[in-house]
Amino acid sequence: MMNDTEFHKLVDHALMIIEEGIDESGADIESETTGNVLTLEFENRSQIVINRQEPLHELWLASKSGGYHFKYNNGEWHCTRSGEEFFALVKRECSVHAGETVDWS
C-alpha cells in the first residue's frame, strides 16, 4: 500500500512525462498545471483534464469521450474499468482531440 508522499511523486512524474511528451510530439497542445490539475487544451478549444484523487490514490482523466479512473499497480497506471494503460489512453485521447497522431517515446 503506497502512502500519500509516494502517490504524489508517482503522479508528478506521470504528469511531467505527459508535458514533456507533448512538447516532443510537436502537436499544437497547450498544457497548464494548476494545483492538482493538468489541463491540455487543443486548437479546437477542446480539453483533456487530468487530476489526482489523493484519498483514492487514483489519477482521473476527463475528455469529450468520457471519464477514466486509473490506479497504480506493478509499475504502471491502469484504467479501473478497461485495464488500459494510462499513457496509451492519453496519447489516443490527444490524437482524437488534436485531429492528428500524437505520440512520444
UniProtKB/Swiss-Prot annotation:
A biological-process GO annotation: iron-sulfur cluster assembly
GO molecular function, one term: ferric iron binding
Signal sequence, renumbered to the chain: none
SUPFAM superfamilies linked: Frataxin/Nqo15-like
Superkingdom classification of source: Bacteria
Classification via Pfam families: Frataxin_Cyay
Keywords: Iron, Metal-binding
Alphabetized InterPro entries for the sequence: CyaY, Frataxin/CyaY, Frataxin/CyaY_sf, Frataxin_CS
UniProt-listed PROSITE patterns: FRATAXIN_1, FRATAXIN_2
GO cellular component labels: cytosol
CDD domains, sorted: Frataxin (cd00503)
Family: Belongs to the frataxin family.
HAMAP family per UniProt: CyaY
PANTHER family tied to this protein: FRATAXIN, FRATAXIN, MITOCHONDRIAL
Record function comment: Involved in iron-sulfur (Fe-S) cluster assembly. May act as a regulator of Fe-S biogenesis.
Protein name, UniProt field: Iron-sulfur cluster assembly protein CyaY
Gene of this entry: cyaY
